[in-house]
Amino acid sequence: MSLRCGDAARTLGPRVFGRYFCSPVRPLSSLPDKKKELLQNGPDLQDFVSGDLADRSTWDEYKGNLKRQKGERLRLPPWLKTEIPMGKNYNKLKNTLRNLNLHTVCEEARCPNIGECWGGGEYATATATIMLMGDTCTRGCRFCSVKTARNPPPLDASEPYNTAKAIAEWGLDYVVLTSVDRDDMPDGGAEHIAKTVSYLKERNPKILVECLTPDFRGDLKAIEKVALSGLDVYAHNVETVPELQSKVRDPRANFDQSLRVLKHAKKVQPDVISKTSIMLGLGENDEQVYATMKALREADVDCLTLGQYMQPTRRHLKVEEYITPEKFKYWEKVGNELGFHYTASGPLVRSSYKAGEFFLKNLVAKRKTKDL
């Protein structure tokens, strides 16, 4: 398993998922006393840092191209540059992770949200994103730099238990469980994910769990396993507008199949919060984005995130356009008008961006008490 900065979903640049933990997490009882103490004492909200975007005063002065011309590679605009998180709290967290022999994609992928998504405070919660089932995917989407293979290594049967134990001891408020695609398995790994959720809830009933799942090849029974596992948020990313699906995603994935995943999760578990994400800057137009958002809302999707596509390596799809912060604000307004309960839209937003923040946490609570 691997720990990912909140989401870091699949569009992080320059790398995507990164590697899983260098070694599996051992049961707490077998850890040395020093590591036991580290697990029991932190990190907590006060250990987390918050980061800001680069100086906004330079945005209006930027004269570079935002749309790619043939043969051109776009320069990174100032609003996609962030300050390097520093200070004693950041260093304390980093040292804690090192002492526990845990490695985060937050660092490996140089995630732009490492400060903000790890941020606590009055209106945010400490959020971590765990990647299950290894670091090798059976699919090859053109935006994603995770390594691929037809037959990845077998699953670690102890991973659900070990993951749940480590997270429960760590004291997080909100955890996102995601995974690679495992088309080599009969159920796509659904049982593995469901077990992890169940173990987590057994150890900490108050923790909020979001699952960012594969499409399980459209297998409804696999979707049901995860939807009925006790999770709070069921997330599955459509990634882009329908017109660009074949260009962007693996041939085994498509918009209609992803929409069926989200619909079926709500059908079998009406109280679950459903969530999806769209990358912008791949060549889509405004009409296509609006139609996609409308279709998602008509499918009763509750939460939507929109973020800037960032090219992971030169082998992957080029960025066709850098979307301005003002345009992202516009799409957030559109999302609210369409009736999404939560719309996060911004250049650095990723699919699990600030997943446990105040609003979404309270949305889960309201849904549980039937107020919404």
Curated annotation (Swiss-Prot):
<feature type="binding site">
    <location>
        <position position="106"/>
    </location>
    <ligand>
        <name>[4Fe-4S] cluster 1</name>
    </ligand>
</feature>
<dbReference type="InterPro" id="IPR013785">
    <property type="entry name" value="Aldolase_TIM"/>
</dbReference>
<dbReference type="InterPro" id="IPR007197">
    <property type="entry name" value="rSAM"/>
</dbReference>
<dbReference type="Pfam" id="PF16881">
    <property type="entry name" value="LIAS_N"/>
</dbReference>
<comment type="similarity">
    <text>Belongs to the radical SAM superfamily. Lipoyl synthase family.</text>
</comment>
<feature type="binding site">
    <location>
        <position position="111"/>
    </location>
    <ligand>
        <name>[4Fe-4S] cluster 1</name>
    </ligand>
</feature>
<feature type="binding site">
    <location>
        <position position="141"/>
    </location>
    <ligand>
        <name>[4Fe-4S] cluster 2</name>
    </ligand>
</feature>
<keyword id="KW-0408">Iron</keyword>
<dbReference type="InterPro" id="IPR031691">
    <property type="entry name" value="LIAS_N"/>
</dbReference>
<dbReference type="Pfam" id="PF04055">
    <property type="entry name" value="Radical_SAM"/>
</dbReference>
<dbReference type="GO" id="GO:0032496">
    <property type="term" value="P:response to lipopolysaccharide"/>
</dbReference>
<keyword id="KW-0496">Mitochondrion</keyword>
<keyword id="KW-0004">4Fe-4S</keyword>
<feature type="binding site">
    <location>
        <position position="144"/>
    </location>
    <ligand>
        <name>[4Fe-4S] cluster 2</name>
    </ligand>
</feature>
<dbReference type="GO" id="GO:0051539">
    <property type="term" value="F:4 iron, 4 sulfur cluster binding"/>
</dbReference>
<dbReference type="GO" id="GO:0005739">
    <property type="term" value="C:mitochondrion"/>
</dbReference>
<keyword id="KW-0479">Metal-binding</keyword>
<keyword id="KW-0949">S-adenosyl-L-methionine</keyword>
<keyword id="KW-0809">Transit peptide</keyword>
<dbReference type="GO" id="GO:0006954">
    <property type="term" value="P:inflammatory response"/>
</dbReference>
<feature type="transit peptide" description="Mitochondrion">
    <location>
        <begin position="1"/>
        <end position="27"/>
    </location>
</feature>
<comment type="pathway">
    <text>Protein modification; protein lipoylation via endogenous pathway; protein N(6)-(lipoyl)lysine from octanoyl-[acyl-carrier-protein]: step 2/2.</text>
</comment>
<feature type="domain" description="Radical SAM core">
    <location>
        <begin position="122"/>
        <end position="341"/>
    </location>
</feature>
<keyword id="KW-0411">Iron-sulfur</keyword>
<keyword id="KW-0808">Transferase</keyword>
<dbReference type="GO" id="GO:0001843">
    <property type="term" value="P:neural tube closure"/>
</dbReference>
<keyword id="KW-0225">Disease variant</keyword>
<dbReference type="GO" id="GO:0016992">
    <property type="term" value="F:lipoate synthase activity"/>
</dbReference>
<protein>
    <recommendedName>
        <fullName>Lipoyl synthase, mitochondrial</fullName>
        <ecNumber>2.8.1.8</ecNumber>
    </recommendedName>
</protein>
<dbReference type="GO" id="GO:0009107">
    <property type="term" value="P:lipoate biosynthetic process"/>
</dbReference>
<dbReference type="GO" id="GO:0046872">
    <property type="term" value="F:metal ion binding"/>
</dbReference>
<dbReference type="GO" id="GO:0006979">
    <property type="term" value="P:response to oxidative stress"/>
</dbReference>
<dbReference type="InterPro" id="IPR003698">
    <property type="entry name" value="Lipoyl_synth"/>
</dbReference>
<feature type="binding site">
    <location>
        <position position="352"/>
    </location>
    <ligand>
        <name>[4Fe-4S] cluster 1</name>
    </ligand>
</feature>
<dbReference type="InterPro" id="IPR006638">
    <property type="entry name" value="Elp3/MiaA/NifB-like_rSAM"/>
</dbReference>
<feature type="binding site">
    <location>
        <position position="137"/>
    </location>
    <ligand>
        <name>[4Fe-4S] cluster 2</name>
    </ligand>
</feature>
<dbReference type="GO" id="GO:0005759">
    <property type="term" value="C:mitochondrial matrix"/>
</dbReference>
<feature type="binding site">
    <location>
        <position position="117"/>
    </location>
    <ligand>
        <name>[4Fe-4S] cluster 1</name>
    </ligand>
</feature>
